[in-house]
Swiss-Prot record:
Keywords: ATP-binding, Nucleotide-binding. It comes from the Archaea. This is UPF0200 protein MA_4660. Disulfide bonds: none annotated. InterPro entries: NTP_hydrolase-rel, P-loop_NTPase. SUPFAM superfamilies: P-loop containing nucleoside triphosphate hydrolases (SSF52540). GO terms for molecular function: ATP binding. ATP binds at residues 9-16. Belongs to the UPF0200 family. The keyword Lyase does not apply.
Length: 187
């Protein structure tokens, strides 16, 4: 059975870092945000937080709250891998989409970090769609919560706290991923 491990969490909680760890373990990674960023560019827009948020909201409004997840399903299947990581679930409709597609093979891991910690990370990472103030991060949180992010986080199978050192977080993510790798290889 194919296993999908998806990361959910508020912006800058550590989803991308967790996905990097998975990639280092040779687990294919599908980044849901890339679907949005691709659509932003397709529409000829500047890839900033405002446009990214607008396009993400528009896709969900026009195609349904699971629009991004549905666009990722074929990418997941095309990997041909028994274990795939999905970075960036944003709402409960996406969780439901993946659970419908992959059944018990879908595992949702929430990553938690406090607002102040997340904002300090945003300031360091320098992505074009990042916000430049803590109020901007709060607004992004509110936008993503409006997509059902809170319900998605509550629906997670496992939570990893990312409030400590990078080394601690990497170890925690490694432990969780290795647990699923091990259970996958035993079948």
């Amino acid at each position: 059975m194919m296993k999908i491990i998806a990361f959910v969490g508020m912006p800058a909680s550590g989803k991308s870092e967790a996905s990097r760890i998975a990639a280092e373990m040779d687990i294919p990674v599908i980044i849901m945000g890339d679907v949005i960023r691709k659509e932003v560019l397709k529409r000829g827009l500047e890839p900033n937080d405002s446009n990214t948020g607008m396009v993400a909201t528009d896709l969900r409004k026009c195609e349904g709250m699971d629009a991004v997840a549905r666009r990722c399903v074929s990418q997941i299947r095309e990997t041909g891998s028994e274990l795939v990581v999905v970075d960036g679930v944003r709402g409960i409709a996406e969780v439901e989409c993946f659970r419908q597609e992959f059944g018990k093979g879908f595992i949702l891991i929430s990553i938690y970090a406090p607002l102040e910690v997340r904002f300090s990370r945003v300031q360091k990472r320098g992505r074009s769609d990042d916000m430049n103030s803590i109020d901007g991060l709060r607004q992004r949180d509110e936008r993503e919560l409006s997509w059902g992010m809170g319900e998605a986080i509550e629906a997670s199978n496992v939570e990893i706290e990312n409030s400590f050192t990078l080394e601690t977080f990497r170890k925690d993510v490694n432990d969780v991923l290795n647990n699923y790798l091990k259970s996958n290889s035993e079948k």
